[in-house]
From Swiss-Prot:
Keywords: Periplasm, Signal. Gene3D superfamilies: Bordetella uptake gene, domain 1, Periplasmic binding protein-like II. This is UPF0065 protein BB4329. Residues 1-39 form the signal peptide. InterPro entries: BUG (IPR005064), Bug_dom1 (IPR042100). Belongs to the UPF0065 (bug) family. It comes from Bordetella bronchiseptica (strain ATCC BAA-588 / NCTC 13252 / RB50). Pfam families: TctC (PF03401). It is found in: Periplasm. PANTHER family: BLR1237 PROTEIN (PTHR42928:SF5), TRICARBOXYLATE-BINDING PROTEIN (PTHR42928). GO terms for cellular component: periplasmic space.
Amino acid sequence: MNKNIPAFHRRCHGLVQGLARTLLLAPVLLALSVPAAQAQTWPSRPIRMVVAAGAGSSVDVFARLVSERLSKALGQAVIVDPRPGANGTIAAQAVASAKPDGYTLLYAGNSALVVAPLMTKDLPYDAEKDLEPVAPVVYVPLAIAVGAKSAIQNIQELVAGAKTDEVFFATPGAASLSRLIGESINQKAGTRLVNIAYPSSPPAHTDIIGGQVPILIDGLGGIAPHAKSGRMRLLAVSTASRFAGFPDVPSISEAVPGLATPSMNIVMAPAGTPAEVLDLLNRHINEITADPAIASRFIPMGGESAQGSRQDTAAMLREQRVEFRKLMQTANIKP
């Protein structure tokens, strides 16, 4: 009998065991390699940017400016897809349920990402778990405005008058950040502002200009053209300091100390999108918004360019959810 046969058997047995281990690990190794492979080949086709606002709105215009530059940076078309309605939840749901492959993104503001989910019953998605931040794009302050013929001349007069009498304020929706700004003023200043929720911004603007409602709280981007044309007068912006585009307009904190609510447009993606894809998008979008040519176009439209990491953006959204949830409880606002 050949003395080398046992050694040969041992070698064969070792090879068989090694092959078996490789076969068992193959699915795991393949699964781990898929995200990396996707990131290396992404994007290989056009990307859809779902916008939580109507075509022609200031949110839509901001999204198109960024998408145009992002297309050039990525070498693929970024197609803007406006999906207005339901305070942004229609657009958010479309993206939350999309395949997390980097080819479907959401462009939305705080109302759609924070306020509407807190104030809407039975949403078919979880805004915190089903969506994740890609990058901030632009700070868009909310503004408090009156019609040009209003007797209210400044924010101090509004606050003083609303402490003794009910004053109605128009917003573009009951589940909007605009409404919570009004409720915040009530809580901090002891005013009696009463919300009139419109289905969208345009009819609210029409009634403010016509004098049917005395006060408007809405995004500065939509109000800015009316303010510049003289049809509305700005009383305050919702930020902690004055806005560069309207330096003569006071911040709300000048009349109500401690009150400031940052409002931001953010690009989001379905949860589970490869981190490499999200990081690449974050880098490109930060570069785009830091470009003075883009930043200078934001300001006349009521926006100030923003940059930040995915982690910092996620933290900001979490903080706002906590803040607004407490405000809703204090003001007895229920979904």
